[in-house]
Amino acid sequence: SIRIKDALRERRMELWLQPILPLRAEGRTYFEALVRLRDADGKIVMPGQFLSAAENFGNMQQIDQFALYEAMNLLGTHPQLALSINLSARTLNHAQ
């Protein structure tokens, strides 16, 4: 949709990290990388409100590329992080 394309172009997509807590106290902390969108007023739009539209309008590859790019930048500055990123099936099936 136009709203999603605008958010990508205007850099209103963000990558948030949610800790994945280990069952044992020792060990490495892992994080799930989650995409969030800010609307034109700066309010957070949760994925349930925009991911279906992104799938329907063919924007998931752009969102996934954003998430991967941001995650790689983050890992470049914080190599000790361990990240999990959810990607769409369409992105994984698309050969480039």
Give residue ranges: language-model regions.
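Bacterial c-di-GMP phosphodiesterase EAL domain
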Residues: 1-96
